[in-house]
């Protein structure tokens, strides 16, 4: 965090999120710095995994949580989690809405399309989907309407996408192509360097040759690609 604080301009919104947290400072002073030290928000002991008490920074038994909401969100998408009115849904909204708003505010300052930001978060921080891909999953209108209901500022690039999305599949004379939204409402085909094909993008423009509950088979330029979508990529009789 401090490295970003040092390099970002003073007017960058990140500074609002980077204020020093006294609890975190105390954890660092205590040596509770993560896995390398064996101490962080969790600690492994002879009695099993322990969790940090956020009040006095001591450790105690880690209770088994009810994961029904998370399991349904995994099946139905992140929007299911954000629509939950409980503490988990509210926490997810507070964290994710700030992150996605910040990403949207960076267009066009750091680039004229969402692709670079999405790639940076996926390749650099191991996100499964980038911020703008998540916004499409959540629903741009749902996201904007909730921000406005909370009297929060809505980034210009996000407002421009109202009633639409940040990515779309467009049909032309050459077939289907994946496009991204640019500032001003224009659309541009996503181009990768020669020899680079991303299946997550290509999959949106083609149909599987065959599919079942556990896997799908695609013909990708005469290359057979099998995508597993079962738990632990397990095969069954199908």
Report residues per predicted region:
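N-terminal glycine-rich phosphate-binding loop for ADP-containing cofactors
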Residues: 1-238
